[in-house]
Amino acid sequence: MNKDYQKFWSSPSDPVHFEVDTSHEKVESMSESDTMNVSNLSQGVMLSHSPICMETTGTTCDLPQNEIKNFERENEYESTLCEDAYGTLDNLLNDNNIENYSTNALIQPVDTISISSLRQFETVCKFHWVEAFDDEMTEKPEFQSQVYNYAKDNNIKQDSFKEENPMETSVSANTDQLGNEYFRQPPPRSPPLIHCSGEMLKFTEKSLAKSIAKESALNPSQPPSFLCKTAVPSKEIQNYGEIPEMSVSYEKEVTAEGVERPEIVSTWSSAGISWRSEACRENCEMPDWEQSAESLQPVQEDMALNEVLQKLKHTNRKQEVRIQELQCSNLYLEKRVKELQMKITKQQVFIDVINKLKENVEELIEDKYKIILEKNDTKKTLQNLEEVLANTQKHLQESRNDKEMLQLQFKKIKANYVCLQERYMTEMQQKNKSVSQYLEMDKTLSKKEEEVERLQQLKKELEKATASALDLLKREKEAQEQEFLSLQEEFQKLEKENLEERQKLKSRLEKLLTQVRNLQFMSENERTKNIKLQQQINEVKNENAKLKQQVARSEEQNYVPKFETAQLKDQLEEVLKSDITKDTKTTHSNLLPDCSPCEERLNPADIKRASQLASKMHSLLALMVGLLTCQDIINSDAEHFKESEKVSDIMLQKLKSLHLKKKTLDKEVIDCDSDEAKSIRDVPTLLGAKLDKYHSLNEELDFLVTSYEEIIECADQRLAISHSQIAHLEERNKHLEDLIRKPREKARKPRSKSLENHPKSMTMMPALFKENRNDLD
């Protein structure tokens, strides 16, 4: 990185080199003497801009000694004021009571201790100062525009002044050229850079102006032109000649790291350039003041006075312009001072924070040392743990090898155990099956023995029964033959009776059919009557409607009471009911005489059925009468006709059911006769077949008993074999358990020793042993 340096001297006689890195990377702390030298230089620069300083350069010849002394006192007073101002600014940085700033600003002297304490934190706060200045320049475009407009106005005034006085403006052109370069640039967004020319800046001390004033007071006989041309004595010229050796070279760009005083830096640079230009002009115009004093003449003195007067006029004009500029700059500087005061108050807060941070840093340092001690302890413990880990790893490797060997043995034993267990399970299943079969065989054998005993008893009983049955059969044959003959006679009689009954039933059916036909004819007649009655009813309704209309009219004409109308209605209803009962009686009398000749010929069962039908008919007719009384005449006639049709249908259905019952009875009688005859003939054959079946069953039972006995013997043999196998398997299981216990005991002994030596490193091993035990179990 390229670095820009600024070099300052406190005076031409004793140069003190101080370098300030203006780059954004490093800022070197300043000592107390360097800060005082910079403040002295800045005071001289500020005095060069004042109108008093401008007057002293050209008008020292006309001033008396008293005025010169007063002028020097004023300069000294102003310098002390500037020093006090800078001292107050430095004191404000460490002042905790911000409210006492107004009292301390004019009274408190320069506090070098506070400056040195602040210099310690200059490197820390550099980044914050740069950021604050960047924020001010970026956040305040009005400030940038004011600076830019002020530079424009200044340039315009200078151009107009140059047009009026081209001779004298050439001298001051060099002085203002470098000072105005900063203002001619447009307001940038980034922090502004102070551009200076690459020439050597030459500074002189306040002693130059003082020496000029003293010599002018000591030599009043010399003319004013002599004072103007020879304003510097030989000693000062010699000192002035030594300045290039102590000159400071500026780079072209100086970053604005001194954020607190950017305007002072710019004015200081322009003032330094004006000092240099005036000194160069005086060096050019004054070759040797002793030789010029001898060669001058009074005519030349007059010419010089005129020139001096003209120059004074022009300088007065310049001073007026300069005063205006300085007034503007003073206003701006006042604003800037207020802003800086606010910044200083903020910086005081930052200083408190920094003090707190110091305390925190000290605490952190103490904690750091404690942590270092703890770290050393932990290192020692880690070394011990590493040694323990190495030993434990060795033991673990040994235990792993043992574990692998044991696992292999365990797998082999487990495989053998699984095979033996499978065999044991299969043999146990076979044993259970054989035991269950044996029990079932015992049960079946006991049952078969019981059945055999029963069959033998039955055989004896059957033999006795067959003998007695043969005797009985012989007797029964004789009796049955006699009964058969008697039954044949009775059967013939029954056939004759059945034929007679059939003929009677046929005649009854014919009569019933005729009655049904008569009923159908009567129903058709009743339908025609009902149709006629409906027509009559419609006519009666129409007449009733007409009569009602007439009655309503007559009621309107002649008022009739309501109870008389109610009596008339009741009389009409009674008349209608009497007519309906007469019609129902006539229909009932017409139906009953037709059925009377049939009842004489029927059996008592038929008479009962006919009486039931008659009662049902009576009940139906009674219901019909009740319905007719409740309903209108039209509905009653239609329902009466429908119910009569239903009654006829019911009668036909009952007749059909009677015929079907008769047929079923005839079939049953014939079947019974045939079955009885067959049973009497086939009894001996059936008994012989049953005896043959019993004999075959006995033979089968004997064969099964023998086969079951053989099966039981085989099962007993198998049980004996299975018992022997079970005993052998139990012995093997005991042997396997002994083999499994031995490696466990061997593994426990070395593990217990290792656990006693290194208890911490073997904390995870019991879990592994538990898992292995669970697997074994």
Swiss-Prot record:
Residues 303-560 form a coiled coil. Residues 737-777 are annotated as: Disordered. Keywords: Coiled coil. Testis-specific expression in normal tissues, but wide expression among cancer tissues and cell lines. Residues 743-752 have a biased composition (Basic residues). It comes from the Eukaryota. This is Cancer-associated gene 1 protein.
